[in-house]
């Protein structure tokens, strides 16, 4: 148990039997009336985002989330198989749980897998990964005064917008949070 005064970004709460991660919080002390805490919460399993307001000092139940560094091994149908780097145990994580991270997962890549009571909740990747471009059209600058971009398919099958000078076979750095091109690797 914790109070709303102890909230931090990333903390996982157990509200009404569901797990919610604190995305953002703000302590508000109006000139008139009692203080309160305004939060933005994200459902860990469904991804639904809600705004919730608590009175200051209200007790909330925190959930114990175990974060472990694991290595991605392979895809098994809809599941993704990860191996714990300390115990070498393998766990299957549902594709829905992996979510957008699947676009940047390569075999043997390390990721952080968060679990609650042995159930995988979500997968966190490093903020950037290096991927090889498997296909992109040749870029023709033409008579444009500004630089343009073009779609490129990377080795995981995801599509990334890259500058016109990038060619097939090059390795690029991609931001895993939003899929942006960061530069050549």
Swiss-Prot record:
UniProtKB keywords = Cytoplasm, Elongation factor, Protein biosynthesis
Q: Give the UniProt subcellular location, in the record's own words.
A: Cytoplasm
Q: Hey, what's the signal peptide range on this chain?
A: none
Query: Which GO BP terms sit in this record?
Result: peptide biosynthetic process
InterPro entries associated with the record: Elong-fact-P_C, NA-bd_OB-fold, Rib_uL2_dom2, Transl_elong_fac_P/YeiP, Transl_elong_KOW-like, Transl_elong_P/YeiP_cen, Transl_elong_P/YeiP_CS, Transl_elongation_fac_P
Query: Known Gene3D superfamilies for this protein?
Result: 2.30.30.30, Nucleic acid-binding proteins (2.40.50.140)
Where mainly located? cytoplasm
**What cellular-component terms does GO give this entry?**
cytoplasm
Protein biosynthesis: present as a keyword of the record?
yes
Pathway participation: Protein biosynthesis; polypeptide chain elongation
Q: What SUPFAM superfamilies would the database entry show?
A: Nucleic acid-binding proteins (SSF50249), Translation proteins SH3-like domain (SSF50104)
Can you name one GO molecular function term for this protein?
translation elongation factor activity
Task: Identify its protein family.
Answer: Belongs to the elongation factor P family.
What function does the entry list? Involved in peptide bond synthesis. Stimulates efficient translation and peptide-bond synthesis on native or reconstituted 70S ribosomes in vitro. Probably functions indirectly by altering the affinity of the ribosome for aminoacyl-tRNA, thus increasing their reactivity as acceptors for peptidyl transferase.
**What PANTHER family has UniProt attached to this entry?**
ELONGATION FACTOR P, ELONGATION FACTOR P (EF-P) FAMILY PROTEIN
Q: What is this protein called?
A: Elongation factor P
Source organism (scientific name): Salinispora tropica (strain ATCC BAA-916 / DSM 44818 / JCM 13857 / NBRC 105044 / CNB-440)
């Amino acid at each position: 148990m914790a109070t709303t005064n102890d909230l931090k970004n990333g903390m996982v709460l157990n509200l009404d039997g569901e797990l919610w991660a604190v995305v953002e919080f703000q302590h508000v002390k109006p000139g008139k009336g009692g203080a309160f805490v305004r939060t933005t919460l994200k459902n860990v399993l469904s991804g639904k985002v809600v705004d919730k307001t608590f009175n200051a000092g209200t007790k909330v139940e925190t959930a114990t989330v175990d974060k472990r560094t694991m290595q991605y091994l392979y895809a098994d149908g809809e599941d993704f198989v990860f191996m714990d780097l300390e115990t070498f145990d393998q766990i299957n994580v549902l594709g829905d749980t992996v979510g957008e991270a699947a676009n940047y997962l390569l075999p043997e890549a390390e990721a952080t897998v968060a679990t609650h009571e042995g159930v995988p909740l979500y997968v966190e990747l490093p903020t950037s990964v290096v991927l090889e471009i498997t296909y992109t059209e040749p870029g023709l600058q033409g008579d444009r005064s500004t630089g343009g971009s073009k779609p490129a398919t990377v080795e995981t099958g995801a599509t990334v917008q890259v500058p016109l000078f990038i060619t097939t076979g090059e390795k690029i750095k991609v931001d895993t949070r939003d899929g942006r091109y960061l530069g050549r690797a």
